[in-house]
From Swiss-Prot:
It comes from Pantoea vagans (strain C9-1). The chain crosses the membrane at residues 1-21. The gene is tatE. Keywords: Cell inner membrane, Cell membrane, Membrane, Protein transport, Translocation, Transmembrane, Transmembrane helix, Transport. Residues 46-67 are annotated as: Disordered. GO terms for molecular function: protein transmembrane transporter activity. This is Probable Sec-independent protein translocase protein TatE.
Amino acid sequence: MEGISIAKLLIIGALIVLLFGTNKLRSLGGDLGSAIKGFKKAMKDEDTSATRTTAEDVPAERVVHKD
């Protein structure tokens, strides 16, 4: 087996365009782009929240009671 050639990919692409139409493919591409953008934003937010200092990370001050 030699794999998928460029000619086969073009035929598959033409069949997909005929089945779904260009408008449907355009909206599908936009939806996919929005999903990827949202995923990247969520990953960035997770990275910044992991680097924030929490109260547990900061050493507490020593309190001395005078009797």
